[in-house]
């Protein structure tokens, strides 16, 4: 069972990661139950309407877990569903795993005057109860270990290279070179750094969010498309000349892999996430000057971007996730990697 507060119709890397993982686990022969806001009464998040917050989910979460009786339970998010599932597991002495997808301390700080230290304390308390907390990159792992997290395991991300692949540049008729941003248009994504950077050509914003109206009014020369999905998203991305990733707070940045799979180099700041995904001078350019990084990325070989991305399949990502799972009961008979107890964690990449 995978419990997540992030699910469709949200459009982000967390949802895409969990959807792909669930699909591949099914291909491996597992019966997967996703517990999502679609199963509950919910309200729109006041600051982000597309995010649904489940209302008073405790009893239904408990019933869902009892009815499904999972061999392994993974809590993917720290929202109402994740909190309810964690509470149930602790009360029933069930073992579980979690994953760290979002830098909530930085996200919250960008919106509200909440001390970062307090947010990390809350996250440490949440994830510390799990047998393993899965993280996507080594730099994130190092950062969390420095903040006292001790139960960390590696869970790399993947990309659908059949969907995201090189395509015709003629798909977009904007003046060249085209620099594209793909993702939520929100304050924590630092989109304005992309829109402010000097650029001779076109800027394309593929996505939507609470900051779109303000930024579209401030930067009328940029093209805002709103959300694009699946083949249409891949076609837009493949037609760009460079993808710019301005975020300073992402734990990974799945769109970086998607751009590389399309043969499009990525420009980003040298921060956690990009430094783990982008090979500077090969698949993209890292620089504290975002415009300089974007201009340098234009000189890179698209074939090298594609070649690096095809090594990152979702099948390998799902296998790594599977290997990190633990049996809910310490004496439970379980198959394959789920039989592994916490003492064998080094084999699954658990930090010390």
Where on the chain are the PLM-derived regions?
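Donor nucleotide-sugar binding/catalytic pocket of nucleotide-sugar-dependent glycosyltransferases
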Residues: 120-167
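Aromatic "clamp/platform" in nucleotide-sugar-dependent glycosyltransferases that forms part
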Residues: 248
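Short alpha-helical donor nucleotide-sugar binding micro-motif in glycosyltransferases
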Residues: 65, 127, 235-240, 321
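Nucleotide-activated donor-binding/catalytic signature segment of Leloir-type glycosyltransferases, i.e.
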Residues: 212-231
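Short hydrophobic beta-strand element within catalytic cores of glycosyltransferases
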Residues: 261, 265-268, 278
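A charged, aromatic-enriched C-terminal amphipathic alpha-helix characteristic of glycosyltransferases
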Residues: 298-338
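Conserved donor-binding/catalytic core segment of Leloir-type glycosyltransferases
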Residues: 168-204
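Nucleotide-sugar donor phosphate/pyrophosphate-binding loop at the beta->alpha transition
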Residues: 95-97, 106-125
